[in-house]
């Protein structure tokens, strides 16, 4: 497999971050500096310069408030990493204007598996709209709607009020819920992610975090195909 994928599976970094490590000459393959795109074969020895032992894998649930940035903050913007004192990164994105559950980890394998479009990983959201929801809204949304030429996958919708609903998706296109609601001639005014697979936001306060551990972690890892429990975590 390619060296960036290998490093991600070993929990060193995401594939993109692994490419950066390789480009900076921080990765050794069989004692020499690795190059981008190289393949790692059975029996090869991969080392990180300056790293002598495997790191402990960490997993956290974080309640991202509105206004906090998950990736590439600009000057003056608050980054998720400012709220969590550990060396972890967010798995996936959550819009600046949205709030709710983010999973933070230093295990690159989680990013690769959770964001892989080949798998259907449930994510649940609480949504409030500007205008009242039409009678046809639930049926149409659940069947899938066309957003700029793309037909969304079937989903589950539960109306919770005249202008509110819960939605469970198994995909994560950019601004998907906002675009789906716009296709239904309405506007999202509040969007909060409440669940990723078995990990729930529950009563976690905004800008607070908690560890994912024990049975909750075992179930989460099993649901993304990581049934083996990593001895380094």
Positions of PLM-derived features:
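Basic, flexible Lys/Arg- and Gly-enriched helix-loop patches that mediate nucleic-acid binding at interfaces
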Residues: 1-233
């Amino acid at each position: 497999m390619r060296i960036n994928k290998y490093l991600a599976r070993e929990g060193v970094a995401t594939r993109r971050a692994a490419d950066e490590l390789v480009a900076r000459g921080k990765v050794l393959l069989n004692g020499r500096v690795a190059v981008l795109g190289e393949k790692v074969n059975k029996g090869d020895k991969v080392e990180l310069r300056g790293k002598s032992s495997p790191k402990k894998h960490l997993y956290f649930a974080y309640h991202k408030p509105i206004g906090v940035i998950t990736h590439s903050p600009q000057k003056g913007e608050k980054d998720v990493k400012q709220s969590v004192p550990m060396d972890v990164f967010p798995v996936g994105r959550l819009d600046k204007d949205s709030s709710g559950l983010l999973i933070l980890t230093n295990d690159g394998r989680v990013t690769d598996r959770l964001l892989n479009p080949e798998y259907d990983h449930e994510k649940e959201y609480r949504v409030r709209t500007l205008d009242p929801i039409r009678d046809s809204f639930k049926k149409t949304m659940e069947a899938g709607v066309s957003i700029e030429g793309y037909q969304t996958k079937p989903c589950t919708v539960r109306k919770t009020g005249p202008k509110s609903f819960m939605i469970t998706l198994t995909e994560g296109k950019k601004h998907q819920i906002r675009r789906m609601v716009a296709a239904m001639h309405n506007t999202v005014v509040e969007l909060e992610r409440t669940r990723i697979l078995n990990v729930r936001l529950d009563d976690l306060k905004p800008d607070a975090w908690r560890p994912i551990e024990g049975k909750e972690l075992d179930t989460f890892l099993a649901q993304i195909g990581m049934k083996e429990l990593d001895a380094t975590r």
